[in-house]
Amino acid sequence: MHPLLTTETGTVRKKWKGHLPVALLYPNTYPLAVSNLGFQLLYRLLNASEEIVCERFVYPQNREPFRSLESSRPLMDFPLVFGSISFEQDYAHLAAMLVAGGVPPYAADRPGKIAAGSPLVVLGGVGVFMNPEPLALFADLMVIGEAEPVLPRLLPALAALTDRRALTEIGATTPGCYVPSAYSFRYDSNGRVREISVSEGLPQQVRRVALKKSDQAAHSEILSPDAELGMYMTELGRGCSRGCRFCAAGFIYRPPRLWSADAVLDGLSQRPPEVDRVGLLGMEMADPKLLDSIAGFLQTNACSLSFSSLRADRISPRLLELLSHSGLKSVAIAPDGCSERLRGVINKGLSEDDLIAAAVALVDAGIYTLKLYVMVGLPTETEQDLEEFVQLVQKIRQEILPIGQKKGRLCELILSVNSFVPKPWTPFQYLSFGGQERERAMQDRDCTAAVLNLKKKIKYLKKAFARVDNLHIKVDRPDKVLSQAVFSRADRRIGPALLDIGMGKATFKQAMKKHKLSSWQYAVRPRGNDELFCWQ
């Protein structure tokens, strides 16, 4: 047993005899893995099967042995390997974990017989059903969609499977199951997808599978003092009805679903009594009736509340009361676009008045640290849009500072400035990373202008806020974000580069050059409206 588990609650330990061993990989560190609700949910669903013993693997740190957390067994002892992937920057980690476990990283190199030593690799998670192709070479099977409706049918089929070549039957009969080896791609001279060929009997398009309703909201199954978030999490629903044009989650989790108050309270009621901090996922969907139910539960159980961010136009008196009683010290609001015009372009639907009113209401409720999240590099963005954001921040300060002073408190603003990355399945999937006009983007074959354009915008905002008291600005590095933009819309040709990066054999730039891949092709090149995408 890993030392980290001595302080963990919710660990599942099963005897191996008579059970099918399943490894569950999370391609990042333990603190992030144990904070990921999707990873925890999959761990519970797999171990809920009487036929399965599931143990977790996380990305190894400091050259520690690559063994399962529960029993310290090597990956080669598991005939079935699941991977839960959420973020593009973890793709290379996944490839490295397979190699560290002694598993041939490419599915094509694994023996036909499925057994310990030559396991079947199944990948899923939001990163996979957004765009499975960057990881297609590493997977025998991929799950396109949410786990709950797929696993009851998939797990018995996998348990009975002995030959990798029989996977096509699962792909043909099980909704949401994608067998990458059964699909081949042809590209034109410009590197764009020209044609997708499919093996006989398989669907031309594997449609995403979604959970229709839930009697119990997904919640933390495992708690650890080493978790990144350090709270008990409960999901209020999935998806979002707002339709912001940049947001992948708002499109790939369609239709938006808000769980019933009974389902949410059932999830909250699983909280260990000694845990008094609750995190809610999906606050932007919560209606007044649900908030009332949650508020009653939290007050009765003396719990405090936390969440990732709030919509500025959904801050009700009941929510403010709940926040005030929770002793929350900071709240994040996401304008996303720098100006009201840009927020219209991205379909955010927030006015300047909404944002100022939200800031005032939050400070009035005793929350003196406000975080504002904004993107640069959005389509049609100009310096005027940046200047309007500077003015917005100044107006917010003018409104909230006197309120804080009357209460003897300093108000603090934290600005998070991030480079916009176009995502699959969104209306912005056709756009260029870097925010350049189409003609300039077509000429920017080394991506230098895209990165410089973003750096220029970030520098403008940093300079504007450099001498402002009680204001902190956090920015990303566009040259580093470029790799995320590449992986986001990449196809399976990126696989060898991911393997080299994961094994530490090359930097991102070196790997792209070695394998004759173009960052411009994936990240900066504008797409045509009639283009065929690999994720389709």
Task: Locate predicted features.
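Flexible glycine/acidic-rich beta-alpha junction loops that bind and position SAM and/or redox cofactors
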Residues: 184-187, 289, 318-319, 341-346, ...
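A short beta-strand-loop structural module common to alpha/beta enzyme folds
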Residues: 50-62
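Conserved SAM/AdoMet-binding glycine-rich loop
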Residues: 25, 265-371, 375-412, 422
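N-terminal pre-triad scaffold of radical SAM enzymes
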Residues: 22-28, 46, 220-246, 329, ...
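Glycine-rich beta-alpha loop elements in corrinoid/cobalamin-binding modules
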Residues: 59-197, 423-491, 500-502, 506
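Iron-sulfur (Fe-S) cluster-binding segments and ferredoxin-like electron-carrier domains
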Residues: 246-263
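Radical SAM enzyme core and accessory elements
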Residues: 1-10, 22-24, 456-458, 462-536
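N-terminal [4Fe-4S]-dependent radical SAM core
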Residues: 1-23, 30-31, 180, 185-234
